[in-house]
Amino acid sequence: MQPPGNDAPAGCPFSGARAQGTQAAHEAPHVPGDAGEQAGWHNAQLDFSKSMSYGDYLSLNAILNAQHPLSPDHNEMLFIIQHQTSELWMKLALFELRGALDAVRSDALPPAFKMLARVSRILEQLVQAWNVLSTMTPSEYSAMRPYLGQSSGFQSYQYRQLEFLLGNKNAQMLQPHAHRPDILEQVRATLDAPSFYDEVVRLLARRGFPIAPSRLDRDWRQPTQHDETVEAAWLEVYRHPQQHWELYEMAEELVDLEDAFRQWRFRHVTTVERIIGFKQGTGGTSGAPYLRKMLDVVLFPELWHVRTTL
C-alpha cells in the first residue's frame, strides 16, 4: 500500500493523477480482456494463420456449406441436416462394422466387441434424431415436398450397405444406384461378400461347433435364413456361457445391435406416419406400409429363436 499522496506504482492501471489524494491506491479488479490477456486467452492459441485450426481439421467450411435448400420453406433446412447427419453416423457405423468384421475373421474378439458396442450406440443416436424431425408438421412438410422430386432415403447407398452387411440381402436394391458406377461397385461388393453374421457363423465352426457345410458355403447374395445347426451351436453357448464366454458375449452384442436397429426402424416408420400418413413415398414405395413390412425382418434369427428353446 502506498502512503497518501504518493504516485501510483509503475505498471498500475490507474494513472498517478487519479491515485493522488486517495487514502490508498486500489488494485484494479480483473476484467476479462485486460492488458496481459490481449495476446491470448488463458494461454490459448488465438492465431491460426500458420497452423491448423479446429475448423480446418474438421473441414467445417465444406460441411457447413453443403446445405442447399431448393424451396423457400424454412423447414427444409431441418430436413436436409437431419438426413446429412444420419449419413455421417451411418458412415461411422459402416467403418466400425467392417473393423469388427476384420477382427472376427482373425479371431480377435475383444476388439470386435468394442466396435459392435459402438455401432449399437450409433444406432441409439439415430433413434433419438427422429425426435428432432418429428417437430415438422404435415403442413410444413407438404410445403417443401414438391421440391424433393424422386429423391428418397430409400436410395441411401450407405443404408443399403448397412442392411447388406447385417445380412438383409436383396439384389434388386442395386438398381437405384445403377446411374453411379462408382457407388454401384461399392454396394455390389457388400452384397456379394459374406455378411457380418455369416462370418460369426464361420467363427462358430472354427470353435468346433458342427455347422452344416451348406451354411458355411452358400450364396452370399441371399438373405440370412434360419439354420438348425447354427441354433444348436448358440443353444450350447447359452447353456454353458462360462465354457464359451467369448461366443456368449458375441451373441449378446449381436442381440444388442439388432435391438437398436429395430428401434431405429420403428421410430422411422412412426415419424413417417406422423408427418405424411400413408401417402406414397417420394421414391415410389408405399411409404409407411413398406417401412412397416421392414419391421418383420430378422437379422440374426437363431439368436432370437434360441431364447424360446432355452
Swiss-Prot record:
Entry binding sites for substrate: 79-83, 141, 145, 282
Record EC number: 1.13.11.11
Quaternary assembly: Homotetramer.
Catalytic activity: L-tryptophan + O2 = N-formyl-L-kynurenine
Residue positions binding heme: 268
PANTHER family linked: TRYPTOPHAN 2,3-DIOXYGENASE
Disulphide bonds in the chain: none
GO MF annotation, one: heme binding
Co-factor: note: Binds 1 heme group per subunit.
Oxidoreductase keyword on record: yes
GO BP annotations, alphabetical order: L-tryptophan catabolic process to acetyl-CoA; L-tryptophan catabolic process to kynurenine
Pathway(s) where this gene product acts: Amino-acid degradation; L-tryptophan degradation via kynurenine pathway; L-kynurenine from L-tryptophan: step 1/2
Family label: Belongs to the tryptophan 2,3-dioxygenase family.
Protein name: Tryptophan 2,3-dioxygenase
Class of the enzyme per the UniProt entry, highest EC level: oxidoreductase
Region (Disordered): 1-39
Cofactor requirements of the protein: heme
Pfam families linked: Trp_dioxygenase
Function: Heme-dependent dioxygenase that catalyzes the oxidative cleavage of the L-tryptophan (L-Trp) pyrrole ring and converts L-tryptophan to N-formyl-L-kynurenine. Catalyzes the oxidative cleavage of the indole moiety.
Presence of the UniProt keyword Iron in the record: yes
Gene3D superfamilies for the chain: 1.20.58.480
Keywords of this entry: Dioxygenase, Heme, Iron, Metal-binding, Oxidoreductase, Tryptophan catabolism
